[in-house]
């Protein structure tokens, strides 16, 4: 559903195998839910789209983690969430045929929006619906829902190296990949590893724009 503003790194050069050779990546488990949620919450705190979509009248970001936790728990039903080191970065994928959340998590998301976001809850839920409507369905693919680098480790290329690690695995299966970029500054970085613009949509009533991107099978 969301790819954020946390990666401030140069474009990848060299082959994917060269880029990932020194990266310590492990598969996340249910026991890592707190850590993954923390990384995503911190990395998206100032994202152009999600900071706007979850802004409460009184300010504050303490509630953000409750929303991201649902996405993390939904993704951890599959073996496609990855962590770098002790929590430097994380990537969250939904494999072909999977869903972002279980039905009970989707219901809880709607309840949480009403409880935490007050007058902007409707716009938030409409935004989520726009993500779903824009998602391509014709061809099975891997779906990058979230990619974030912990703020303490930004600027070192870790996020893009993690993405390269993931794409190496996906390429081994000769499968396409899809993501949504909520920060225009990241679009060129995704293009550097083979993603192409697919479409776009905006925040309800005007505001930040999301670019959808597709990477053909290799």
Please describe what each predicted stretch is.
Residues 24-38, 42, 46-47:
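A short beta-loop-alpha structural element at the N-terminal edge
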Residues 160, 172-174, 183-200, 206-207:
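Conserved active-site alpha-helix within GNAT-family acetyltransferase domains
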Residues 149, 155-168, 192:
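Conserved acetyl-CoA-binding loop-helix of GNAT-fold acetyltransferases
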Residues 140-143, 169-182:
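Conserved GNAT acetyl-CoA-binding A-motif
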Residues 57-80:
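Active-site rim helix/loop that mediates acceptor-substrate recognition in acyltransferases
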Residues 90-150, 154, 204-205:
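Conserved acyl-donor/pantetheine-binding loop and adjacent beta-alpha core of acyl/acetyltransferases
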Residues 73-93:
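Conserved beta-hairpin
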Residues 145-154, 178-187, 204-208, 215-217:
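Conserved beta-strand-loop-alpha-helix junction that forms the acyl-donor binding cleft
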């Amino acid at each position: 559903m969301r790819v954020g503003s946390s990666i401030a790194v140069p474009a990848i050069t060299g082959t994917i195998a060269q880029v990932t050779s020194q990266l310590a990546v492990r598969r996340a488990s249910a026991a890592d839910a707190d850590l993954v949620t923390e990384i995503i919450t911190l990395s998206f705190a100032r994202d152009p789209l999600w900071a706007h979509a979850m802004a409460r009248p009184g300010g504050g970001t303490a509630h953000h983690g409750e929303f991201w936790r649902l996405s993390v728990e939904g993704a951890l039903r599959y073996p496609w969430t990855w962590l770098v080191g002790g929590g430097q970065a994380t990537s969250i994928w939904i494999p072909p045929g999977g869903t972002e959340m279980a039905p009970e998590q989707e219901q809880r998301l709607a309840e949480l929006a009403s409880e935490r976001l007050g007058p902007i809850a409707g716009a938030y839920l409409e935004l989520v619906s726009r993500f779903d409507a824009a998602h391509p369905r014709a061809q099975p693919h891997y779906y990058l829902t979230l990619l974030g680098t912990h703020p303490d480790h930004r600027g070192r290329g870790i996020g893009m190296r993690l993405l390269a690690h993931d794409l190496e695995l996906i390429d081994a299966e000769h499968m396409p990949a899809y993501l949504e970029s909520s920060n225009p500054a990241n679009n060129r970085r995704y293009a550097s590893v083979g993603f192409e613009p697919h479409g776009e949509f905006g925040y309800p009533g005007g505001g930040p724009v999301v670019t959808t991107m597709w990477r053909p099978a290799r």
